[in-house]
């Protein structure tokens, strides 16, 4: 079960969300309909995962990489907002799980406060994995550069042993470029 969030908080956030440019303009009608009907807004729970056995509404802004609209109705995916709106009108007492995709949502405290606890934990883990990924990428990059430097230094030694001045100068130039890139 989701975290309790007041209808006023949901309304305030959804009004802000509607100021964003949505990928599917007809999805805006659904959110406006929810805002106009208190009893439906009571049923809305913000989440980050599609609930296979529940009604889940997914809406994205233009700044998101996610699809613009999808409505999951008991394991069926519906991409027509008009049909989704009809389903919401026909079954007003059923819970509505809402997934919103927009730029900066991982840092939007108002949004994060409304997410159910499982979703908050999911975002927390995602942020941690992003930090691990960045750390790992920079470590791998440093190791690759260090290996390339060692290889160039060995080749420079070989060029000196063979008294190959042209190759020596080329390799020194490559080493200097590598040093500039890694600084």
Curated annotation (Swiss-Prot):
SMART domains associated with the record: IDEAL
Entries under InterPro entries matching the protein: IDEAL_dom, UPF0302, UPF0302_N, UPF0302_N_sf, Virus_scaffolding_prot_C
Highest taxon above the source species: Bacteria
UniProt cross-references to Pfam families, sorted A to Z: IDEAL (PF08858), UPF0302 (PF08864)
Family of this protein: Belongs to the UPF0302 family.
Protein name, entry field: UPF0302 protein BH3876
Biological source species: Halalkalibacterium halodurans (strain ATCC BAA-125 / DSM 18197 / FERM 7344 / JCM 9153 / C-125)
């Amino acid at each position: 079960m989701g975290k309790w969030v007041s209808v006023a908080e949901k309304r305030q956030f959804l009004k802000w969300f509607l100021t964003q440019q949505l990928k599917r303009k007809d999805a805006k009608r659904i959110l406006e309909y929810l805002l106009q009907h208190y009893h439906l807004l009571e049923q809305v729970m913000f989440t980050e995962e599609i609930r296979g056995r529940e009604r889940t509404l997914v809406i994205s802004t233009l700044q998101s990489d996610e699809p613009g609209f999808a409505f999951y109705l008991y394991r069926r995916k519906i991409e027509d907002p008009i049909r989704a709106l009809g389903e919401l009108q026909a079954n007003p007492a059923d819970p509505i799980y809402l997934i919103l995709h927009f730029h900066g949502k991982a840092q939007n405290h108002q949004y994060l406060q409304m997410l159910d606890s499982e979703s908050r934990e999911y975002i927390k883990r995602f942020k941690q994995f992003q930090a691990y990924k960045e750390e790992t990428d920079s470590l791998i990059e440093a190791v690759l550069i260090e290996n390339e430097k060692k290889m160039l230094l060995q080749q420079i030694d070989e060029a000196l042993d063979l008294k190959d001045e042209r190759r020596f100068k080329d390799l020194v130039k490559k080493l200097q470029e590598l040093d500039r890139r890694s600084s």
